[in-house]
A protein has these predicted regions:
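Domain-scale recognition of functional cores that engage charged ligands
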Residues: 46-380, 390-400, 406, 493-495, ...
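OB-fold and OB-like single-stranded nucleic-acid-recognition modules
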Residues: 319, 327-510
Length: 510
């Protein structure tokens, strides 16, 4: 098969190598991506992780949030700074699919084509959804006569439809997804600040939009530039070049954001952890959502505080304290043990479900991994994907938040499409301890990637994407707990009609 021969770095040619360096890309990372593309092209089967069983409440793979004493956790919450971390660089192409004919017509300054596109939108019920103000202005202009559409209005329509999804209206009043997320963070309280990952060159636009929401919470913006991207490759494995001989970069998946986590500490020096949610998942601030989120945060802080004490005891080789603290963590999460059980072994094998070969020799390695709390919402019986499972990852039985591309067809039918087995799924509701550079480096060789096949410039190209929630949600790389949270925290907006005709008050209670 074409692409089975490994390509060497120097096969790129000096010009391509210079372009990669000038784009601030790490050539060793791009080379690794290239080898993965070649591996995928050479393989007859997609890379999958065989599933032993799903994680469920009944088998301890998923846990319920414990009730904590507020007096105990108040100080810990103050000591453990958490920053909201929101990936928001994604385009809105899928969300705005019904508006593409209007966008194309506005780009051509074709008022008649705009009128046809708007008529179709009205027939499809799109005009009742949250839309940019320019579309309503355009509709007024069209009703007044097609000759009255100005170039400025055409430009405004193009600019607003072509905006990143974060800046798009989420409610009828026009408040954007970014504004709603900021309001949610404001109402939640207890956060050090918030960071939004935005497209290249759009940080000023994001900052301007965030400033429309009055809040003492500091907002920071990190642009997802070429250093977080990968390259497109031909089926031969060679770097794909455009008609001008230039390389073509493309986002390398949310997993590429992982190296950004240490930067959170640079922006917020007191930060210990991040709270990750998607920009287009609106939770609102109902009492159910706020209480569940605070409980989630409190349990994370309590557990991380005890893990810190565990690390301190390990540094002093204090086995008495180690066993006592380990038992305290088990008690919080309701893990019962026998008197003969070693609390440390039980902590990692029965709570974190990770591989323990020998104690206490394994302890430093296990404690070096970040603590991750990954929320899981009940499955409506129609949700497939983002399922937490016990799987074979490179020969080890591991707890894993698995994505559909890494599931065989048989396992998909037996586990993911079986509502009795796939009882919960990942809504992207995650609190993760900020990892050190050693752990970031360890993730460089992770197996949680896939190769996307896309049409580009009239030909098929391939590129690697890393899957963040498999990386954070694997028991080999993190001390991860899957925890049930209410379905109310999960309201994704994947199409315009998901927004419906909702007003701001539907989500944010004053």
């Amino acid at each position: 098969m074409e692409g089975t021969t490994k390509t060497k770095k120097w096969d790129w040619g000096q010009d391509v190598l210079c372009q990669i360096r000038n784009a601030n890309m790490d050539e060793s990372v791009i080379f690794a991506h290239q080898q993965r593309v070649l591996e995928a092209l050479a393989s007859k089967d997609n890379r999958t992780f065989p599933i032993f069983d799903t994680c469920r409440l009944e088998n301890g793979g998923i846990l319920r949030l414990p009730q904590l004493d507020q007096k105990i956790i108040s100080q810990e919450n103050d000591d453990i700074g958490i920053v909201a971390f929101v990936p928001a660089a994604g385009a809105s192409s899928r969300y705005l699919a019904p508006l593409i004919p209007l966008l194309d017509a506005a780009r051509m300054r074709d008022a008649e084509a705009c009128a046809v596109a708007v008529m179709k939108m009205e027939m499809d019920g799109v005009m009742s959804c949250p839309l940019p103000s320019s579309i309503k202005l355009l509709l007024t202009a069209l009703k007044s006569g097609i000759t009255k559409v100005s170039d400025d209005l055409f430009e405004q329509v193009v600019r607003e439809i072509d905006a990143p999804k974060a800046l798009y209206p989420a409610v009828l009043e026009g408040d954007s997804f970014l504004c709603l997320k900021r309001l949610e963070h404001k109402n939640l309280g207890g956060l050090l600040g918030e960071i939004y990952i935005c497209p290249p060159g759009r940080s000023a636009d994001f900052n301007r939009e965030a400033s429309t929401v009055a809040s003492s919470l500091e907002s920071m913006f990190i642009e997802q530039d070429s250093s977080l991207a990968t390259l497109r490759f031909e089926s031969s494995g060679q770097v794909a070049l455009d008609d001008h001989g230039q390389i073509s970069s493309v986002p390398a998946g949310h997993g590429a954001l992982l190296p950004l986590l240490p930067r959170v500490r640079e922006l917020f020096p007191k930060a210990r952890a991040v709270f990750i949610r998607n920009i287009d998942n609106i939770s609102g601030n109902s009492s159910l959502v706020v209480e569940a989120t605070r409980s989630f945060k409190d349990n994370f802080c309590r557990t991380l505080s005890l893990m810190d004490r565990l690390r301190e005891a390990a540094s002093q080789h204090d086995m008495v304290q180690l066993k006592s603290i380990g038992q305290s963590i088990l008690d919080i999460w309701g893990i019962t043990t026998d008197a003969a059980d070693d609390p440390l072994e039980s902590l990692f094998s029965r709570l974190f479900h990770t591989n323990v070969t020998k104690m206490p020799e394994d302890l430093q390695r296990l404690l070096a991994r970040p603590l991750v709390l990954m929320g899981q919402v009940p499955n409506s019986a129609n949700d497939v994907g983002g399922t937490c499972v016990f799987a074979d990852v490179d020969g080890w039985r591991q707890k894993l938040c698995i994505e559909v591309p890494h599931v065989s067809e048989t396992d998909r039918q037996v586990f993911l499409e079986n509502a009795a087995k796939a009882t919960h799924f990942n809504p992207v509701f995650v609190m993760a301890e900020i990892p050190g550079q050693t752990m970031i480096n360890a993730w460089n060789s992770h197996p949680f990637w896939l190769v996307a096949k896309k049409s580009w410039n009239g030909r098929q190209v391939y590129y690697q994407e890393s899957i963040l929630y498999e990386m954070l949600g694997c028991g080999h790389y993190a001390n991860v707990l899957f925890v049930e949270v209410p379905r109310a925290v999960f309201n994704p907006h994947k199409s315009l009609k998901d927004a419906g005709q909702k007003h701001l008050r539907h989500w944010i209670k004053s």
